[in-house]
Design a protein with these regions (language model features):
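Macromolecular interaction modules
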Residues: 1-213
């Protein structure tokens, strides 16, 4: 995150009060082997209607930067965990030197498992590429991750932002891409927006609440 390559990310999704989560849960995960840093986040657009989630919605997100020694713990009641490893391709975007204070979290899977690599190639060489080229204000690095052990959601696109209004930045992204590739009724836009065997599992915006030292 920010100015470093993170081998893996472990996410926890919860409706628990964020102060309680930060006090009781964050230290327990940080104490595990392979965990380097933690941040915790507030969902700023819960129950969004434009991209309704397949995964259960949640209020707060814990993000743990982990290395290859990490093994995901059993999540306590009221918490759902997802362990992702950095995909072998690089992230795209810019490093501004400012802290990551906003996120756009995108979780996707292939409808047909046999097309997983085709979906991954589309995401890297078409979808994320055009977003990075659009230079969306507030957007920094966009990094691909793959779920450890397979299953759903298969891939994570982790959009880091240096703006404290991540939802506004997210909503500005598609119009800026349209300026580059064409309107929503063009083949170019459809190719960008609708990947092969794409199943959108979750999309939302998050604002940072706190971080470990």
């Amino acid at each position: 995150m920010e100015d470093r390559i993170t081998p893996g990310l472990y996410l926890e999704m919860t409706d628990r009060a964020i102060d309680e989560y930060a006090r009781d849960r964050v230290p327990a995960v940080l104490a595990r082997p392979g965990v380097q840093r933690a941040t915790w986040w507030r969902n700023v657009k819960r129950d969004r209607a434009d991209l309704p989630p397949v995964l259960p919605e949640f209020d707060h997100l814990g993000v743990y930067e982990v290395d290859d020694a990490f093994r995901a713990p059993e999540a306590p009641p009221g918490v759902t965990g997802h362990h992702f490893r950095h995909y072998r391709r690089p992230g795209q975007g810019i490093v501004t030197g400012r802290p990551t204070v906003g996120l756009s979290l995108v979780l996707i899977s292939p409808k047909d498992e046999s097309r997983a690599q085709e979906l991954r190639d589309w995401a890297d060489f078409v979808h994320i590429r055009h977003i990075a080229e659009a230079a969306v204000p507030g957007y920094c690095m966009i990094t691909p991750y793959e779920r450890v052990g397979g299953g759903d959601p298969r891939f994570m696109h982790f959009y880091e932002m240096d703006t404290d209004d991540p939802e506004r930045a997210f909503k500005s992204m598609t119009p800026l891409v349209i300026e580059r590739i064409g309107a929503t009724d063009t083949p170019e836009f459809r190719h960008w927006a609708f990947g092969p065997s794409l199943r959108i599992m979750y999309v939302n915006s998050f604002a940072r609440v706190g971080a470990s030292s």
